[in-house]
Curated annotation (Swiss-Prot):
Highest taxon of source: Bacteria
Spans annotated as Disordered: 138-160
Signal peptide: none
Tagged with keyword Electron transport: no
Species name: Prochlorococcus marinus (strain AS9601)
Protein's name in the database: Large ribosomal subunit protein uL16
Originating gene: rplP
One family name in Pfam for this protein: Ribosomal_L16
Basic and acidic residues: bias regions: 147-160
Molecular function (Gene Ontology), one example: structural constituent of ribosome
Entry keywords, A to Z: Ribonucleoprotein, Ribosomal protein, RNA-binding, rRNA-binding, tRNA-binding
The protein's assembly and partners: Part of the 50S ribosomal subunit.
Alphabetical GO biological process terms: translation
Function text: Binds 23S rRNA and is also seen to make contacts with the A and possibly P site tRNAs.
GO cellular component: ribonucleoprotein complex; ribosome
Amino acid sequence: MLSPKRTKFRKQHRGRMRGVASKGNTIAFGQFALQAQDCGWVTARQIEASRRAMTRYIKRGGQIWIRIFPDKPVTMRPAETRMGSGKGNPEFWVAVVKPGRILFEMGGEDITEETAKEAMRLAQYKLPVKTKFISIDKNLENSSQENTKDSKKSQEEVKQ
């Protein structure tokens, strides 16, 4: 399971999850992705369970990228312990997820949209946040490349 090798401090405050994800909200590696629509904590066990479900479904077909990392320690007190006497010990690690955050990406030559959608659906069941399947639109990608080529040509014409 995922966890940091070392941290500056053993324990953290719980914090608040306000607003939407400003980083990690676009597809960077693959063609298909699973995007969070709610905020919440995703534990290292849930990330691993989702990864296994997707990997088993696609077999050796493509590649999976995990875009979140559990870097927040969650502490717990022992059962039937009286109040007070300090904060509990770190028990597990969570990743703080805000709406819009990309959780997993999938890509490869052999991966079709239907295969990716089904694999992501299996992963959705393992996660505590509401998610949606998104994909890169090929037409949109090609048009953006053409626009950059046109802008480069116009810049060259201006220089001359």
